[in-house]
């Protein structure tokens, strides 16, 4: 990649499309044996109750429709098979991203505004950053390309939080205030490491349940 800040045309996504795109990136790394994902597996991933903000309840028809829309936008690709159609993401190729940038965007698609520390901790199963500078550089490149934004700090927040712009411009002040009032953010918790490990274990259980559902289906 060059130092140019030009970005390929970026289609705006709705909330369901954004969730599913993030899931495809995540599951490529965490469940490679069942990737690309079937519609059922994508639905299970999208509706996980851990590592998701907000928690959603998307029906199978809406999942299939959103996946087809992502394919039409060039952000996903369908694989046909005799048993079930499967989908893979094309986020990295479509937007000419590095792996690091792709992972950061996926986390923001799945979990909303996060600090640099949260992004680094939560990315470990997808990409292990060499150090904080590597992650910060990837964030700066995404900012230059207008793919994410730094949110203004709400009262009591000690760190900057970042949000993707794949669903369009955001009201940074309102989003930051809502995030603060909800008590979100592991960096402000008493034991952020423990909270994140619990979330990872719960996500692993959800992935196993999704794989079992796929085998039964």
Curated annotation (Swiss-Prot):
InterPro entries: DUF480 (IPR007432), WH-like_DNA-bd_sf (IPR036388), WH_DNA-bd_sf (IPR036390). SUPFAM superfamilies: Winged helix' DNA-binding domain. It comes from the Bacteria. Belongs to the UPF0502 family. This is UPF0502 protein Smlt0097.
